[in-house]
Amino acid sequence: MKKILLTNDDGYHAKGIKALEQALEEMAEIYVVAPKHEKSACSQCITITAPLRAEKIKGKEGRHYRIDDGTPSDCVYLAINELFKHVCFDLVISGINLGSNMGEDTIYSGTVAGAIEGTIQGVPSIAISQILSNKNKNTPLSFDLAQKIIQDLVQNIFTNGYPLKGRKLLNVNVPNCSLQEYKGERITPKGYRLYKKEVHKRTDPKNESYFWLGLHPLEWQKRENEDRLSDFDAIASNHVSITPLNLDLTSYDDLKSLESWHEGMLK
């Protein structure tokens, strides 16, 4: 039977990861290793300066752990290299995140980081996120569509193989709409996010300053000279966006111009 490792950044008890397990439990043998507490926006943080404690969850056949103060990257690393080191995972899936992971969100996202860690460890990986609100602001949150999408994706992967080669992963965002309003899926590039940048300064009882960072999404910016619609465009029209992400951050288009610039600097 196929084996899938689940993680998230909303925490072990989050509704999204429970919905994810429920969607897949008849398709594969499910293992869950997730942070004990919420770790949203922790990015690719991995713990190397403090110990990690893994708590085995009773009644889950030894397949569920929550990691005290662990990040999604910690969870996936620990699961593959120690907790279930004798298990050959077919997929790592991170989610279902409560909120979008599009554009620059992917850099901050702990959800995407969990899938990235799976990719680093050599396992095909998917990050999946549920949009909390869009133009249908009165639509109650439901994971029905996200569950259907992940079931379809996983079945396709099990039947036809993982679609990406090398150190790449799938990033999936699901619109906040009903199954009846859903328009289909689009393969999209990552768009550009515009944020409202806020810093909230406060004073504690000892008259010392502390800060809350606010990084609230405002809108997105259209991609220039791009025929293909972005992940934001897909979500805005009630489509699921599926975006391939590459771990190689090298800007190959700039290598030659950078060489010329560097040669000029040496003259």
UniProtKB/Swiss-Prot annotation:
Its main location: cytoplasm. Coiled coil: none annotated. It is found in: Cytoplasm. Pfam families: SurE (PF01975). SUPFAM superfamilies: SurE-like. One of its GO terms (cellular component) is cytoplasm. Its EC number is 3.1.3.5. InterPro entries: SurE, SurE-like_Pase/nucleotidase, SurE-like_sf. Binds 1 divalent metal cation per subunit. The keyword NADP does not apply. Its cofactor is a divalent metal cation. Nucleotidase that shows phosphatase activity on nucleoside 5'-monophosphates. This is 5'-nucleotidase SurE. It comes from Helicobacter pylori (strain P12).
